[in-house]
Amino acid sequence: MKARRQIAVVTGGRKGIGLGIARALAKGGFDLAITGIEKEAPTAVLEELEAAGGRAIYRQSDLAVLSAHAATVDAISAALGEIDCLVNNAGIGAVTRGDFLDLAPENFDRIIDVNLRGTVFFTQAVVRSMLAAKTSLAPRSVINITSVSAALSSPERLDYCISKAGLSAFSQGLALRLAETGIAVFEVRPGIIRTDMTAQVSEKYDALIERGLVPMKRWGEAGDVGSIVAALAKGGFGFATGSVIPADGGLGIGRL
């Protein structure tokens, strides 16, 4: 009898770090559901993921719309089967960088609604589905993609840092809540990763990396994060939960 492929959901999986994660999971034998706010399905991305041998679907989803989460989870489960792994990757950057004293409440609310509130309640919907499932014997996990900004502050984008620090705290509490259920929870903290989001500051970080900001002296790539996530999702760390894994080339290591 052919073994069932594990099923993973990657929020924000159509580009950037999310796509790097989706590619690594597809190569690792997962069927995939990727989500995004765009209406049109990323046909080329889905074809690429399916070329690895499994199934791939797209579901439009705005994390800030809490009322739609249950329907999104139900649709994914109906199309692919029981969810084994949730990768919370989707998020937005600071709406406007600048002095904290000029931070607009509506901009703060927007980033918290997506990065923290939306992610928390989408996770709730997925975990409820996982706990209701009775047939899957595959390793199960929730993997939260945060940022070095969860611990290293940037005063000009404090709202973003707060959202990631909150997601880090959520990861710890969720790990404790789910420990006895067999659902592992991990936090992966990317550093300076080459994506569309960082393209506008690439020259700045090229110089900083060359001067040693990142001890490994290179940009991180989306695939670097993806390989870590795939290893965690496969269940090879059976006695670990609540672990924080940096993907930052040493950026977060304290130095004198």
Task: Pin down the residues of each PLM region.
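Residue(s) in the substrate-gating loop at a strand-loop-helix junction
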Residues: 147
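Alpha-helical segment proximal to the catalytic Tyr-Lys
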Residues: 128, 176-177, 238
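Short C-terminal tail/terminal secondary-structure segment
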Residues: 97, 212, 230, 241-256
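Active-site helix of classical SDR
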Residues: 123, 163, 171
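Short, small/polar-rich loop/turn modules that mediate ligand/substrate recognition or access, typified
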Residues: 179, 184, 240-242
